[in-house]
Amino acid sequence: MNRFRIVLVVLALAVSVGVSGCVTGKVMTLPGNLARSGMREAPQTAAAGRVVAVLDFTFAGTPPYEIGRDFDHARTIVWKGDPGEAMADLVADVLDEKGFRAVRVPSGEAVPGDAIARVWGTVDKFRVDSRKSGSMRLKVESAASVSLTVYGTGGSAPPNWNSTVTSDFWTEDALFVTPEGVRKAVTGAANAVAEETVRRLVAAGVIPGGKSHPAPGR
């Protein structure tokens, strides 16, 4: 091993020890809420009467939700947001972008009477794990996986229509894991699921008058 590689290894170990010393309570809390990671399309003007009701998706557990693990620091990753509400928000946002007037319906509230379609379901998986990667372990990879089972009624959809959508998304941080990097991975996976969910809703005829878009390449 040459001198340059020795210096890099020593620096990496020093940073790792320093970061580990700053960890309190063996918990990493993710900041903020999920958001659309750059709109793929400009929002379109919603047509009158085209209201789509998106009910909060269900998710097992109680807040703050344990959604993953930082293996290098042996700590859990928690998020104070609600994955079911967050996914409903993202699906509604994608519908808005495509020209539908989407209304998110919180749990226990009535569906608007003028809704042309109703969307609901369960968040089956909402997880992100982080660990060091690479031959010298100088990078940290955060791998997120989100899975959603969606149901829909309305339009020309067949009875009991449902579909399961899953997406994985990876990000890398230099040297050590950060809450922002972990959140970016979760946001990427969640947005991909929301976009594909809307595509399938339109293709199945749950939402009348829509145009089916091909799934983006990954």
Predicted regions and their residues:
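Surface-exposed patches in mature extracellular/periplasmic domains of secreted proteins
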Residues: 101-108, 205-209
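A structural "domain/chain start" motif
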Residues: 22-92, 198-218
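Structured segments of extracytoplasmic/periplasmic soluble domains
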Residues: 90-101, 126, 192, 196, ...
